[in-house]
A protein has these predicted regions:
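Arg/Lys-rich amphipathic alpha helix in sigma70-family domain 2
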Residues: 65-71, 82-104, 115, 167
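A short pre-motif secondary-structure segment
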Residues: 136-140
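Internal acidic/polar
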Residues: 5, 90, 98-126, 146
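A short, charge-rich alpha-helical start-of-domain segment used by transcription regulators
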Residues: 7, 16-40, 50, 64
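C-terminal edge and immediately downstream basic/flexible tail or linker adjoining helix-turn-helix-like DNA-binding
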Residues: 2-10, 17-18, 26, 102, ...
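DNA-recognition helix of helix-turn-helix
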Residues: 85, 89, 154-178
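C-terminal flanking helix
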Residues: 35, 39, 60, 130, ...
């Protein structure tokens, strides 16, 4: 779903309070700017475009309900990414528990569908990285964020992000046999 349609759909689900209407112009710009990148990050982290869009919608609802405070932040997009990363972490915990339970019940391995075998292998390898390395890789590559932006979102020094990227790339090279 493109950002415009998603925004219109999200707003149509809300009440017509004058308070919300006052907030919409600045929030709408934020939504249109951040939505595509947030979807890319969520999709890369959870491996499902639909689940990623759901998490981004939840993130945007949280952003709108707190918009007066969020819009005053130096980097509202960084705040939204942090909220999204927390949602993705929760999703992984839930999914891992559910997948393990289903695998025991059915005695089959859970599968993840994707666009191509290479993409599945790559993003599967990324998802097996330690959490911080996974988040750094996804924010930097799928989220198209700079080292400084990733550092700000994760509240770590830039040097830590660079180190994590180097370690994550090395781990991926080993996992993918390159």
């Amino acid at each position: 779903m493109d950002a415009t349609l998603a925004f219109d759909h999200a707003i149509s689900d809300m009440t017509d309070d004058a308070y919300i209407i006052e907030l919409i112009p600045s929030f709408e710009d934020f939504y249109r700017t951040e939505y595509p990148g947030l979807v890319a990050v969520a999709t890369a982290l959870v491996g499902s475009h639909e689940a990623g869009e759901d998490m981004v919608q939840d993130t945007m609802v949280k952003s709108l309900t707190r918009w007066q405070a969020v819009q005053r932040l130096e980097r509202p997009g960084g705040w939204a990414h942090r909220v999204l990363l927390n949602a993705c972490t929760s999703w992984w915990r839930r999914h891992r528990t559910e997948a393990n339970h289903l695998a025991r019940l059915r005695r089959v391995e859970p599968t993840v569908s994707g666009p191509s075998p290479d993409a599945l292998a790559f993003w599967g390898a990324v998802r097996r990285l330690p959490e911080r390395h996974r988040m750094v890789m996804v924010l930097f590559y799928a989220g198209d964020r700079s080292v400084a932006e990733v550092a700000s979102i994760l509240s770590v020094p830039e040097g830590t992000v660079k180190s994590d990227l180097t370690r994550a790339r090395a781990a991926l090279a080993i996992q993918l046999g390159e």
